Curated annotation (Swiss-Prot):
Disulfide cross-links: none
Function: May be involved in transcriptional regulation.
Protein name: Gastrula zinc finger protein XlCGF48.2
Biological-process GO terms, alphabetical: regulation of transcription by RNA polymerase II
Top-level taxon in the UniProt lineage: Eukaryota
Keywords noted in UniProt: DNA-binding, Metal-binding, Nucleus, Repeat, Transcription, Transcription regulation, Zinc, Zinc-finger
Keyword Zinc-finger: yes
Main location: nucleus
Amino acid sequence: MMSEEASGTVMGNKERIVTLTLEMIYLLTGEHYIPRKKSDDGGALHAPGSVIQKENNKNDKKILELMSNIIQLLTGEEWGCLKTNTISHGETKKENPQQLYLPDCDYEDKADININLNATVCFDNESNTNVDKGANRWEARNVPKSEFLPEEQPCAANSIKEESELCKAEYRPDCSFNPLGKQIQGTDTPTANVGSSMNSSLSDNYLLKTIKEEPDSCEEEKLSDYKIITVSEPVAEDQNPAPSCSQNNRSLPNYVSNTIKEEPYDEEHFSDYRIITVTDPTQVAGTSPHSTENGEYDSSMAACTSQLSKSALNVMFNCNVCHTAFNNKSNLVRHQRIHTGEKPFSCSECGKCFRQSSQLFLHRRNHTGEKPFSCSECGKCFKWRSLLIKHHKTHTGDKSFTCADCGKCFKKFSRLTEHRKCHTGEEPFVCSECGKSFAQSPQLDLHMRIHTGEKPFSCSDCGKCFTQRADLNVHRRTHTGEKPFTCSVCGKGFTRRTQLNIHNRIHTGENTFTCPECGKCFTQHSHLLAHQKGHMGKKPFCCSECGKRFRQSTQLYLHQKAHAGEKPFTCAECGQWFKLYSILVEHQKCHTGEKPFSCSECGKCFKRHTLLTEHQRIHTGENTFSCSVCGKCFTRHSHLTAHEKIH
C-alpha cells in the first residue's frame, strides 16, 4: 500500500514537473504545448496553442518561481537563492561546487557526480546529437540563464554533497565535464555530449535546472534560443553531422543547438522530456572558445572550427582562364567577357557594341550631345569628368609634372614624356617618303599630309582648307575679328601668340636678327631675309602683267592690285579707296588729327613712324643717302632722287 502511494506521489510529481516546465516554456517563447501519450504508430504530436506577443521583463519572477518548484519536486529541497534577483546561482556556487544525489534511485558505485553550475552538459545514451540550426530566437531581456544537467547515473541519496575539488578534465563516466568552460547564453555553440558509456535506463533520467540572473544591462541578443522538437521518429545520425577530430584518441564533443526536445510522454518514462541549452563561450572576456574546463587549449576543436569557418566563408569565384579571383559572381561574368570577346550591349544609333552597360551609357552622350559636367569658373561643359578635371588646371595653373633637365612644368604626364625627347634627341618616328624623323607620332601624321596633300579641315565661311585644326581655328579669327592676344603695353591685339611676341620686341628694343652685310637689325627673321635680297640684287617675284620684279611676295601682291584697280579699303569720312588696310589707317589720322609718334629731342609729332625716323636724322646729322656722282649726302631718299636729276 505504501509502495502504491509512493508510486502515485512520484508520478504526480512527474506530471507536476511536466506541467510547470511547459508553463515556463510558454512564458519564454509564447507558445503553448500540450503533451500527449504515444499513439499506436509510435508517433507523438504536440498541439501548439495560440501564440502571443512576448512581454519583456515581466515574466522573470514567474519563471523563477516555476523553476524553484521544479527543483523542489526533484530534490525535495527548496533553493533559497532563487528568490533573489541580485545574486546569480552560478556566482554563489562557484567556490563550493556541489554534488547531486537524485531521489528514488539506487546509488550503486557511490561515485560522486560533480555539478559545474557555470557549464552546460548534456548526457544522452545516443552516440550523436542532432544539430538543429533553425532554433527560434526568443528576445526577452533579463531572462534568467538556464543550465540543464540530465543525470544518467543512478543514485540513491536525495541530498547534495559538497566536494572540495572539481571534476578533472578527463572524460570519466561518473563525472560531468564541459570542455567549453564558462559560457554566455544566446548563441549557438558546440556543447559536449559526455557520458555515452553510461548504461542506465532512460526512465531513470532526471532534470536539474539552475537559474542565473542577468544584470539589467544585458542585451536582448544575449538570451538563449529555445525550440520544441517532437521526436516521433528516430533521428538519422547523419543529419547535420558535427565535425570530429582525433587527438590523443579523444573525440571532439558533438555539436547541439539551443533546442528543447519534446518526446512522447509515458507514465514510466518521464525523462523523455529533455531540455538542452547551449551558450557561446566566445563572448566571455578572458576565455577561449577552444579551452577546457581547467584552462587547457584544445587544438583539435580549434582545427575543426577553423576548417568549418573556411568552408562556410571565403567563397571566391575564380576565372578558369587566368585564375583571377572575385568575391562576386557578377564581377566574374563581366571579367570573362574579356576572354570571350562578348559585347552584349549595342548602340541603337551606330551599332557599336560594348562589354558593359555603363560603357554604352557613356557612349550615348556622343549622339545626344549631353555634357553633364560643367566648369564652375567659366561654365564650359564636358562629356566626361576626366576632361573637366583637366580643364580645371587651366584656371588653377596647376602644372604637376616638371622636367628634371630644364625645370619646365607641364599639366599632363604625356606632355612631359614628349618633352623629354628634346633632351635625349630621340626621334623614333621616321617618314617613309623623305626619311625625316620626329619625336612624336602626331608630328609624323601631320607631316605625312604634306606628301598626300590631305587637308581635312575646311573653313565654313570661305571654304579654305588646312592640314591642322589649329590652323583652321586661327583662320576663323579673321572672319570673327577675334584677337585674344593683347599687348600689355599698348593694348594692341593679335590673332596669334607669335605675332604678340614679335610685337613686344618693339617696346623692348630687342633686334634679334642682324644683317651681316650692313649690320642693320630687324625684329623678325622674314624682314632680314627680305633685306638681304637687296644686297644680292635678287628679286624673285615677278609681275605677270608688266614684268616688274620684287624682293617680297607682299610687294608683288600690292602691285598686282594696281593693275586690277582693286581698292577694297574705303575711308568712311571722305570715301577715298586704298589698296592696303595699313594705308587706310594712316589716312584716317588726317581726319582725327592723331599724331602718336613724337620726337624726343624737339617734341615734334608725326602721323607715321617713318616720318619720325627721317626727322631724327636732322638731330643726329646722319646722311644715309649720298650721291654717287658728287658725293652729296641727304637724309631722305626722295631728296637724293631729286638731286640726281640735276646730273
